[in-house]
Amino acid sequence: MNLAVEIENLTFFYPDGNKALDGVSFVIPERSKTVILGHNGAGKSTLLLHLNGLYTASRGRVKIFGKVINEENIREIRKKVGLVFQDPDDQLFASTIFDDVAFGPQNLELDKKEILRRVEEALKAVDMWDLRERPPHHLSLGQKKRAAIAGVLAMEPDIVVLDEPMAYLDPRGQEEITAILNRLNNEGKTVIVSTHDLDWALEWADYVVVLNAGRVVAEGDKSILTNRQLLEQNGLKAPLLVKLFEDFEGKLGIPTNLKEARQILRKFIF
């Protein structure tokens, strides 16, 4: 298994002495769709900020494609790892969406033709090209999130990290973001998402990491999401499909999406 990310005994203290991460160790497979789960305060956002060097470990290390993040390679790491913040207003600052998405490529000192190519491809990938001259503050939340993703895509990273991308979105907005994430993964990118939405995680993810109190309590494939006891012990609610089918697990199995649920029920009823 080729690894995109390796976290080894990662410990992090905030300046006030609060320990946010406590000996965290896990791996993320290359080209996976990985979810980072945990209740509020579990350490998810703090962990994600280590993946492109915005935070520096107090102890331990983070490896990206086998290379330990350090001061010498941090610029190269940030080309490989793109981070999308939970609140797009923390990321969008230029007068237009076009200028915002162009900011990263411009700092790479690319020529104008290459910058335009990257910006156009990134905005079209999130269906925002027609809104390229619009100011960010004139966008809906879903549009802002897509614009923030475009800003990351313009850097052409191999790993895309998103902190709570589904937060506060309506169902249509969630579907749009999910489609973008699936397309990125189909293109060969490793996609890492923190979320509280375990129903969405069960359907979307193929790799799962669960945090509690700054520690990893579970890591592996999505079968973790069918372990209701584990989830609830760590402050998480089991997915609805797990609750509905857990009493019949031995006979019917637990589906990971509505399509599988329908197939199971048809076999059981007919």
UniProtKB/Swiss-Prot annotation:
SUPFAM superfamilies: P-loop containing nucleoside triphosphate hydrolases. ATP binds at G38, H39, N40, G41, A42, G43, K44, S45. Keywords: ATP-binding, Cell membrane, Membrane, Nucleotide-binding, Translocase, Transport. It is a peripheral membrane protein. The keyword DNA repair does not apply. Its main location: membrane. Forms a stable energy-coupling factor (ECF) transporter complex composed of 2 membrane-embedded substrate-binding proteins (S component), 2 ATP-binding proteins (A component) and 2 transmembrane proteins (T component). This is Energy-coupling factor transporter ATP-binding protein EcfA. It comes from Carboxydothermus hydrogenoformans (strain ATCC BAA-161 / DSM 6008 / Z-2901). The gene is ecfA.
